[in-house]
Amino acid sequence: METTNKANTMMAELKTLCNKDNIVLSLSQYEKLVGYALLLEDWNNKINLISRKEDAPILIKHVFHSLLIGLFHQFSSSEKVLDLGTGGGLPGIPLAIAWPDTQFLLVDATGKKIAACQSMIKSLDIKNAVAVHSRVEELKGMSFDTVLSRQVAQLEQLCSYASKILKPGGRLICLKGGNLDHEIKKALAGKKEKGSFPSVVEQFPVSGYSPCFTEKHIVIAR
């Protein structure tokens, strides 16, 4: 009963946030997103997937935060998406739930984290996401329209990884925090030196969507 009440409260909160920002989801998608938040919380008690010193609910700080990417990039049915360094499935699993016609590959170099992702994907019956224990260097012969990352790595390094596996015209989308001016400058300088990706880097502040997202940005490199 307690779990049911908690899930109902979480769903009502998520619906309020999504409706406010015109994020359209079905009842089944809401149920899966709340289910994922509960599973992530449970798994995080076993292995360290996200910080255990959370200052905000997982549903907002991690799940809703991931969904905001869809306000700045519309995923398509023909799109192949890589979630690089997915950790506990972020942002890949929430986005796979919200865009069931888009294919998502989640990779991480830590086997325990991928095992958790695989279990959650199976429990939630998500058909369009696959989690693989791998490093980006091992994804030989694969290419993607979009690369996602929530890693703390510098943007220049993430751009370097993405440039090797992005299709022409592809983009890297990152969830990052703090003042990014120096990171963006370095990433663009790296392009000038090496003659490669990215040509343009845009940053979109998301602090207006929740007090939890102070100094948070969605960064899109093309």
UniProtKB/Swiss-Prot annotation:
GO molecular function, one term: rRNA (guanine-N7-)-methyltransferase activity
Enzyme Commission number: 2.1.1.-
Matches recorded under InterPro entries: rRNA_ssu_MeTfrase_G, SAM-dependent_MTases_sf
Major enzyme class: transferase
Protein task: Specifically methylates the N7 position of a guanine in 16S rRNA.
Protein family membership: Belongs to the methyltransferase superfamily. RNA methyltransferase RsmG family.
Protein name, entry field: Ribosomal RNA small subunit methyltransferase G
